[in-house]
Structure formats: C-alpha cells, structure tokens
Amino acid sequence: MKYFLYFCSLNDKMDDCVVKKGEIRNNMKRDYTKACSVALIAVIYIIAGFAGWLLFDWLTLQAMPDIWALLLADVLATVVVWGFGLLYENVSVYDPYWSVFPPVVYLLWAFHTGVWSVPVILLLVATWYWGWRLTRNWAITFRGIGHEDWRYTKYRSLHPLLFQLINLFGLNMVPTLVVFAAMLPGLQLYEAGASANILTYIGCIVCLASATIQLIADKQSHDFRAAHPGKVCNVGLWKHGRHPNYFGEIQFWWGIWIMYASLYGIDGYIGGAIAMTALFLGISIPLMEARQLANKPDYAAYRQHTRILI
C-alpha cells in the first residue's frame, strides 16, 4: 500500500497521477487524480475481500453455518473499508461497497456450492448487470479520494463528537446489513432443487428492467446537469418521478425476492426487500429532498407536480 501511495505522489514528472494540493482531506496531505483514486479504492477492496474470505474460510472450518459465516465476513470486510475511510478521512471510500459485494458474492457462492442451476444463472445475470450499472455510475461521479459526499460532510458538521459512531454504524454497517438482508432470498436459490418457472423469469426481468431504468435515469441526469447546471432535471424519466434511480434500486431488490418467491413462496425473507424500501423512503429520499429544496429554488414547484417515484 505504501508503495502505491508513493507512486501516486511522485514529482512533477508524474503530473498525470498527482494533482495540486488544494482541498486536501486525506492523511497523506495530498489529493490524487481520479485514476489513482480509483486504483486505490480497488486495492482497498481487494484487501477487504481477502480479509473477509479468510474469516469465512476459518469460520466454516469451525462448523459455523455458511450463511452466518458469510454475514460475519461481510461485517469484517465493511470494518476494513471503514478503517481505510478513517485513514483517508473520507467516508466515501465505502460508497462502491453497495454495488460490488452482491454480484461478487453471488458468483463466489456458485463456486462454493457448486450450484449452477437456471435460477442461479438468472440471478447472476441480473446482479452483474445491476452491479455494472451502479459501479459505472459511481466511477463517473467519483471525483477522487480527496472528495467526500455531501451527506457525510453534513453529518461531520452536525455531529462532530458522535460522527465516528454514526460513521461506523449508520453510514457503513446499516447499509451493509440491509443489503445482506436483501441478498438472502437470492442466496436461497442455491438451495433450491426446482427448475426455474415463469415467475422466476419474471423476477429476473424485473431486475433487468430496474437496472435499465437506473441506467437511463443516470444518462438523462448527467446530460441535463452538464447542459443546465444548477437547474432541476425534469426531462425523460425525471419528468414523471423525482427519483427514478431510487425507484429502480427498490424495484431491483423486489425482483430478487420475486425470483425467490417463485420457488419458495411468501415467507420471512420478504423482510430484506421491505428493509431496502424503508431505507430509501425513510432516509435516502428525505435527505436528497431536503438538499434539493435548499439548493434549487424551483425544486419546490417541481416537487408539487411530480410524483416521488415513477
């Protein structure tokens, strides 16, 4: 790690890797270019993933059930990412975790269980497409390791004494646990001996359609903001709903549950999709709404005649 940081902070001959010193947030007292920042995030996630894999392997050797071992490995990987966030004084180090963990784990779970049934293949297709879309959007909007998302800087300023507790449990661990709960229905597909049925395919289609909605919403938002900075995006999907990207995210996890329900019926595993819906409706959307109302005078009028979701 230290050699990577040294590489990214070489002298003027490495101008493509190092930018000027302003707006510095990390402990190295230097802000890296986007390319080096993305590479650094990748290294961090490899370290976190390796730590989680070692713990999972050890716990399963102790005869712990695989699902519980995976949960604890997920928690450990989150703590590792959180630790690097502390090192760089940037909670945004955690941001890609949401889109990276599910597709990677679902794929590794197929190798772990040796199950490559049609429902599992449908699950992998859906989650890798979704993960590609979400990670791609993160890569487009990511400004570098020296930039922290406005939500986190807001919490820093509002709760300076409690921030690190909020950081670990509220900003890192809660999303990890909600995503894990939403993933559980998908993990059960590896146990099913039944073949896919029409509802399984419908669930996959819901997932693919949801990720496509998000992809379209991303493109429309990026294009609009580039052409009309500071204005409210009210074109395309955004004309019909204030948060089409969040709508797609919520719907995606319901699609995963539909795939599960097609084989097992309705039971307690519906809780993951419900928790995901509650997270967006109770936290993510209200936070975004408050920011938009504060920063864009015409957002109030847009809010009055546009539904919250599509």
Question: Where do the protein language model's features map onto the residues?
Answer:
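Interhelical loop and helix-boundary elements at the membrane-water interface
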Residues: K29-C36, G85-Y97, A139-D149, R156-V174, ...
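General structural concept
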Residues: V91, F101-V104
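Non-catalytic, usually N-terminal nucleic-acid engagement modules in DNA/RNA processing proteins
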Residues: V80-W82, S99-P102
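Short secondary-structure boundary segments
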Residues: D66-N90, R151
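Juxtamembrane inter-helical linkers in multi-pass membrane proteins
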Residues: D149-R156, H228-N234
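Cationic, low-complexity basic patches in intrinsically disordered or flexible, solvent-exposed regions
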Residues: Y3
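Hydrophobic transmembrane alpha-helices
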Residues: K34-T60, D66-W68, D74, T78, ...
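Short, positively charged and aromatic/hydrophobic N-terminal segments
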Residues: Y6-S9, K13-V19, E23-N26
